[in-house]
Amino acid sequence: MTPPCLNCSFFPGQLSPNASTGLLSCNDSEFKEHFDLEDLNLTHEDLRLKYLGPQQVKQFLPICVTYLLIFVVGTLGNGLTCTVILRQKAMHTPTNFYLFSLAVSDLLVLLVGLPLELYEMQHNYPFQLGAGGCYFRILLLETVCLASVLNVTALSVERYVAVVHPLQAKSVMTRTHVRRMLGAIWVFAILFSLPNTSLHGLSPLYVPCRGPVPDSVTCTLVRPQFFYKLVIQTTILLFFCLPMVTISVLYLLIGLRLRRERILLQEEVKGRISAAARQASHRSIQLRDRERRQVTKMLIALVIVFGTCWVPFHADRLMWSMVSHWTDGLRLAFQSVHLASGVFLYLGSAANPVLYNLMSTRFRESFRETLGLGTRCCHRHQPRHDSHSHLRLTTVSTLCDRNSRDVPLAENRDPGCEQETDPPE
């Protein structure tokens, strides 16, 4: 996503974005430090090039190719995820509702944010969508980004409750509860997007002694930078640092709980007299250990993807808000961070379906079925450990829940999957 200053060639501290719209007095003390005698003899095109940079970024072609690849993979993957969850009743589980909301958020980022950013990279100025388009773009992109973070955090909390407090999950983590949570997530994301949106607007380039430059309007920061700095720091704290700490702690507690259960099960097996019972229990423990290893891998993958893809984005915003005097070195560093933030942010939106496909047998088979490719083998003829050994992943652990609409998450456990049958056509 583009930085809060949507034209990354324009940096704060050069000219006042909310100055008077009239001709600027050459004696005005506000502009003495910015005044350049050369500006009096430059054409409007030269002024735009000097202060706003070229209309098209230098790296446009490689960025365009990279973004298009991400767009195709992400749009198809998230679109297929939404289709699978909507069309297959077996996928109507509480956990998958979170995945559906996350996929919708990622789709909006890819369908709205990515094309607009490519357009601005090719045509930085003037901004063509008007004031309404400026506000709508900031609000929409900010909302879907915040909603993505909240969805991942809520999904992690759900997994923690289901694994560590299964009794509470029976009565609390129902589908109705999840629907309400999703509604609250999106409302909350919209409300927290309003402050940043209100700080932006349309502003032309102002040059001392020359006034506003024609065809230089950009959708950028139009309020004092102090307020923007406060909003950005608060947003980073609430929607990155706090979620990352929360998710890491929850996953650590889940891992400790699974390890503790494994030790208890091993001690229980040792205490049994029957060799046959001991052997059967040993096989059961092996299957559960396999599932738990998959759970751990999925949790680690989610944390790494989430953190890696969002660090450049927040570094971009923080740098833009904190730097008051831009040197050539800082400008070059900011442009590099800005390009990286866009690639990683969109890459993160495209990565989730890839994770589902790599780490969930059920999702792979559902994708194949939705695409009309069939499945490699039928569940009811598979060995039991193959049919559900990968189901208790962090984001797809309740996919084995069949034919129930309000079954609590705690009941979507492995033993329940053993009795599963295909839903009626």
Curated annotation (Swiss-Prot):
Role of this protein: Receptor for the neuromedin-U and neuromedin-S neuropeptides.
Q: What are the alphabetically sorted keywords of the record? A: Cell membrane, Disulfide bond, G-protein coupled receptor, Glycoprotein, Membrane, Receptor, Transducer, Transmembrane, Transmembrane helix
Which residue ranges traverse the bilayer?
60-80, 97-117, 138-158, 182-202, 236-256, 295-315, 332-352
Q: Which domain of life is it from?
A: Eukaryota
* Family, similarity comment: Belongs to the G-protein coupled receptor 1 family.
Q: Which GO terms describe its biological process?
A: calcium-mediated signaling; chloride transport; neuropeptide signaling pathway; phospholipase C-activating G protein-coupled receptor signaling pathway; positive regulation of calcium-mediated signaling; smooth muscle contraction
Q: What is its main location?
A: membrane
User: What is the name of this protein?
Assistant: Neuromedin-U receptor 1
Q: Which Pfam families match?
A: 7tm_1
User: For this protein, what is any one GO molecular function term?
Assistant: neuropeptide receptor activity
Chain positions covered by the region annotation Disordered? 406-425
Q: Which residues are glycosylated?
A: 41
Query: What subcellular locations does the record give?
Result: Cell membrane
InterPro entries from the UniProt entry: GPCR_Rhodpsn, GPCR_Rhodpsn_7TM, NeuromedU_rcpt, NeuromedU_rcpt_1
Spell out the GO cellular component terms annotated for this protein, sorted alphabetically and separated by semicolons: cilium; membrane; plasma membrane
Task: Provide the topology term for how it sits in the membrane.
Answer: Multi-pass membrane protein
Q: Which residues lie on this side of the membrane: Extracellular?
A: 1-59, 118-137, 203-235, 316-331
Cysteines engaged in disulfide bonds, as pairs: 134-219
Which regions of this chain are Cytoplasmic-facing, per the record's topological domains?
A: 81-96, 159-181, 257-294, 353-425
Give the tissue specificity: Highly expressed in the small intestine and lung. Low expression in the central nervous system.
> What organism is listed for this UniProt entry?
Rattus norvegicus
